[in-house]
Amino acid sequence: MTNLRKTHPLMKIINHSFIDLPAPSNISAWWNFGSLLGVCLIIQILTGLFLAMHYTSDTLTAFSSVAHICRDVNYGWLIRNLHANGASMFFMCLFLHVGRGIYYGSYLYKETWNIGVILLLTVMATAFVGYVLPWGQMSFWGATVITNLLSAIPYIGTSLVEWIWGGFSVDKATLTRFFALHFILPFIITALVIVHLLFLHETGSNNPSGINPNSDKIPFHPYYTIKDALGLILLLLPLLTLALFSPDLLGDPDNFSPANPLNTPPHIKPEWYFLFAYAILRSIPNKLGGVLALLASILVLLIIPLLHTANQRSMMFRPVSQTLFWILAANLITLTWIGGQPVEQPFIIIGQLALYLYFLLILVLMPLAGLFENYMLEPKW
């Protein structure tokens, strides 16, 4: 009798995706983040579902309902802490996953890469609307400041902002619709993830060398299932440590005060994973310019495949490109730091320099490095 896993219509899909999938024999730990992101998504959906059972999306009771979850619901504090810190882990894995894609040339699988960029934008949108829900000071003012950016759009800007708000300011209508969006978006993300995997399995995984791995493949199970299990343990360790020992470490103290439209916090800033984008937004003195730079900082990922000039796919054997890649990584860390600082010198000029360097590296220096490396590898005799 043929194995059910190879004949049953549903089991066959699972089998071809996670069990008998031919995988390159040399993929490193950098390839673990895809499965870790899947686990993060599952954790966020499950914890979010249980939080939604006790949360109320009304301006009068939202803040109290979160306090109620933490105080009165069985293990509510744990569910909330896992959800809040799970978002940080999600973004940590996302940034490393994107970085891996840039370093090893995975962006040359254009469909997979483009769906991935759309996923990144969708996850960022989900995190933003989710941050508004506890209805603390930073939730309220963060929502006000970021939605207000749309008013920079010529002609329709103001009407668009009021349409999103559902009134003339961030209020009950805004909170209710943000809750609805925060509930539905993870399921849209799940659908996009399936499409992402569908495109990936059309081509098979890339590998650190960037060379076609078809001559040397191994089955996904047991080799990479056990490797992913180790990655999962190493992900859960910091997540549980954060959630159980210092759950508020990455949060903002201002969010422990209920939202007050009459009192603006001294420094409005988002969660750490948005600080790089916030720094880019603030680095341009013009409102519309800042919004365009903010959009460009993420959408620039879409044109990275078009800027690939090197004859080799991966940066593994390209030292000049490697150096520029790590400068880019340091630059993003600098932007993250600047995003959390007040708008004063020397932070303003550092932020502006980091912004220019960010686009210079991606759009000019890295493509030039690829051409230079091609030239250096050509035989000169």
Swiss-Prot record:
Binding residues for heme b b562: 83, 182
Membrane-topology descriptor: Multi-pass membrane protein
Keywords: Electron transport, Heme, Iron, Membrane, Metal-binding, Mitochondrion, Mitochondrion inner membrane, Respiratory chain, Transmembrane, Transmembrane helix, Transport, Ubiquinone
Entry cofactors: heme b
Binding site for a ubiquinone: 201
UniProt entry tagged with the keyword Nuclease: no
CDD domains the UniProt entry points to: cytochrome_b_C, Cytochrome_b_N
Cofactor: binding details: Binds 2 heme b groups non-covalently.
UniProt cross-references to InterPro entries, sorted A to Z: Cyt_b/b6_C, Cyt_b/b6_C_sf, Cyt_b/b6_N, Cytb/b6-like_sf, Cytochrome_b, Cytochrome_b_C_euk/bac, Cytochrome_b_N_euk/bac, Di-haem_cyt_TM
Residues spanning the membrane: 33-53, 77-98, 113-133, 178-198, 226-246, 288-308, 320-340, 347-367
The keyword Electron transport belongs to this UniProt entry's keyword annotation: yes
Primary subcellular site in the record, as a coarse category: mitochondrion
GO cellular component, one term: respiratory chain complex III
Ligand binding (heme b b566): 97, 196
An annotated GO BP: mitochondrial electron transport, ubiquinol to cytochrome c
Record localization: Mitochondrion inner membrane
Matching Pfam families: Cytochrom_B_C, Cytochrome_B
Disulfide bridges in this chain: none
Molecular function as annotated in GO: metal ion binding; ubiquinol-cytochrome-c reductase activity
Record's function text: Component of the ubiquinol-cytochrome c reductase complex (complex III or cytochrome b-c1 complex) that is part of the mitochondrial respiratory chain. The b-c1 complex mediates electron transfer from ubiquinol to cytochrome c. Contributes to the generation of a proton gradient across the mitochondrial membrane that is then used for ATP synthesis.
Note: Heme 1 (or BL or b562) is low-potential and absorbs at about 562 nm, and heme 2 (or BH or b566) is high-potential and absorbs at about 566 nm.
Membership in a protein family: Belongs to the cytochrome b family.
This protein's name: Cytochrome b
Organism of origin: Myrmecobius fasciatus
Organism placement in taxonomy: Eukaryota, Metazoa, Chordata, Craniata, Vertebrata
